[in-house]
Amino acid sequence: LEATFGNVAGLAFTESTELIFSRSNYLMYGNNQSVSNINTFGFSQKMGESSVLALSIMSMGFGEIDITTENIPEGGIGTYSPSLTNIGVSYAKEFSNSIYGGVTLRLISEKIYNLNSSGACFDAGIQYVTGSSDHIRFGVSLKNIGSRMLYGGDGLSFRGNAEEGDYFLTISQRSNDFELPSLLNIGLSYDLPMLTEDHRVSTSGTFTSNSFQKDQFRLGLEYAFRELVMLRGGYVYQEEVTNSSYEATMSGLCAGLSVELPMGSSKFGIDYSYRDSKVFQGTHSIGVRIDL
C-alpha cells in the first residue's frame, strides 16, 4: 500500500486487504515541536485475481499561527491554521508474472486563512520483475502530472482609500497560477544471493528528475530476517549538496525499522523512520499496518 507514494505499480502486490495509518512530525525543532504534522491513511483491496483498488488520504497541518497585519504586526487578533489535504484513488494490475502497472487520481486542497486552492493530478508507474528468483526489479514512475492551481478567496481583497474623494473602496488583487511539482523516478533494486532463506539483503538506487529543483540520487539498503524484522538505511544525494548555499532541506541520511507480527492468517506491522535535515532536527514517522 505504501507504493501509492513511490510507484503505484507496487500496489499490485497486495495479496488481500491492507490498512495503514501513519503520522509524521515534519522538521522537528525546540522541545518536541515540528513545523508540520502529517497524518496519512490508506486502504487497499484486491479485486479478482490481478487487480487492486486503493484509497489514500493525506492531511498536513501547521498548527495555529497568529494573525498579523501592517497595523498590528504583533498579533493578538486571532489565529489561523493552514492545511493541505490530498485524496487519492489508485488502481494497479498484474499484467503478467513480470509486468505490473498502476495509476492514481489525486484531488488536492490547500487552505491558508481566507485563501484556498484546489486541483487534480495523476500519478502513473510501471514495474518489471525478472531473475531466477524475481530478485531484480526495475521501475519508472511519474508523479504530480495535472492542472495548474490558483489561489482565490476573500484574502485577495482589502479596503483602501480612494485616490479622489473621502471614501473607501474594496480593492481586489489577482493571484498568479502555478504548476504542481511534477517529477520522474527511475529505480532499480537487487536482492543479494544468500545462503539461507531466513535472511534477505536488498540494494536499491533511484534517480529523481524534479521540475523545480536539482535532480536527486537515492541509494538504499535493506536487511530482513524471516520477513519479520526489516532494517533499512539510505542516502539522498543532490548536486552541490556539500555547498551550504545550495543544499536541500531534506537530503543526506535516512533510516527505518519495520516489525511484522503474525496474527493467524493476518499480520500486524509497525514502521518507524527518520530522515535527516540540514536546518531542523529531522523528521520522525511512525505507522501501523494490518494485512487481513
Regions found by a protein language model. Name each.
Residues 1-292:
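Subset of outer-membrane beta-barrel
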